[in-house]
């Protein structure tokens, strides 16, 4: 019988590092400005976002090998996720329970529409709305560790439907791109309506 692997949790280690930095500051052995700067970084929201994405990738990437190989591959995947988001909001992990009522949001876009996959609507009172964390304009990067960047719309739908118990989403808030995409779709719909109208005339 295979041993169960504990999910990775780095929050305790980050807290311990902050505690050690406080001790070093009290000792007066090192310049306090540098220690305080490092402490601010470790306690920042950005560091928390990196930690969350790293932990989620570590727990879901399908990598065989030693813990060192797994950690190295996870670090590379985390850097790739943040590099891809440069100039945009940083990725966040949102976990939602999977219930009979669905997840409570709609998606649009996909490779076939030459656009990323986006959360186009969070249904008021639905699961996503009640749990918070997910908003209209979030780009969907992965579903339970499987990347949906550059994928067909249907693949994201299948992954969301196949999720059991709960679903972990990595998302990034980029509402301007969603607005541009919706404007493009509206132009296409208007052009189609004009063509249909002309063909009936």
Curated annotation (Swiss-Prot):
**Listed name of the protein:** Protein lin-7 homolog B
One BP annotation, GO: exocytosis
Q: Return the PROSITE patterns for the record.
A: L27 (PS51022), PDZ (PS50106)
Q: Which gene encodes it?
A: LIN7B
State the organism of origin.
Bos taurus
Q: Which family does it belong to?
A: Belongs to the lin-7 family.
Which InterPro entries is this protein grouped with?
L27_C (IPR014775), L27_dom (IPR004172), L27_dom_sf (IPR036892), LIN7 (IPR017365), MAM_complex_regulator (IPR051109), PDZ (IPR001478), PDZ_sf (IPR036034)
Anything noted about its domains? The kinase interacting site is required for proper delivery of ERBB2 to the basolateral membrane. The PDZ domain regulates endocytosis and recycling of the receptor at the membrane.
**Subunit structure as annotated in this protein's UniProt entry:** Forms a complex with CASK and CASKIN1. Component of the brain-specific heterotrimeric complex (LIN-10-LIN-2-LIN-7 complex) composed of at least APBA1, CASK, and LIN7, which associates with the motor protein KIF17 to transport vesicles along microtubules. Forms a heterotrimeric complex composed of MMP5, LIN7B and PATJ; the N-terminal L27 domain of PALS1 interacts with the L27 domain of PATJ and the C-terminal L27 domain of PALS1 interacts with the L27 domain of LIN7B. Forms a heterotrimeric complex with DLG1 and CASK via their L27 domains.
Q: Which residues form the L27 domain?
A: 10-65
């Amino acid at each position: 019988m295979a041993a169960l692997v504990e999910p990775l949790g780095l929050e305790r280690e980050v807290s311990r590092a902050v505690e050690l930095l406080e001790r070093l500051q009290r000792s007066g052995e090192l310049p306090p400005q540098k220690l305080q700067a490092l402490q601010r970084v470790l306690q920042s929201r950005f560091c928390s976002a990196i930690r969350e994405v790293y932990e989620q990738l570590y727990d879901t990437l399908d990598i065989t090998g030693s813990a060192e190989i797994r950690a190295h591959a996870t670090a590379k995947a985390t850097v790739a996720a943040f590099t891809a988001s440069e100039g945009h909001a940083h990725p966040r992990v949102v976990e939602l329970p999977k219930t009979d009522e669905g997840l409570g949001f709609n998606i649009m876009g996909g490779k076939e529409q030459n656009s990323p996959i986006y959360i186009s609507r969070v249904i008021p009172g639905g699961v996503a709305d009640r749990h918070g964390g997910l908003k209209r304009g979030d780009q969907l990067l992965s579903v339970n560790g499987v990347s949906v960047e550059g994928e067909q719309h249907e693949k994201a739908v299948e992954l969301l439907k196949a999720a059991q118990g709960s679903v972990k989403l990595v998302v990034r808030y980029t509402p301007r791109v969603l607005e541009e995409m919706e404007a493009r779709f509206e132009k296409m719909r208007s052009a189609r309506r004009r063509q249909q109208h002309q063909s009936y005339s």
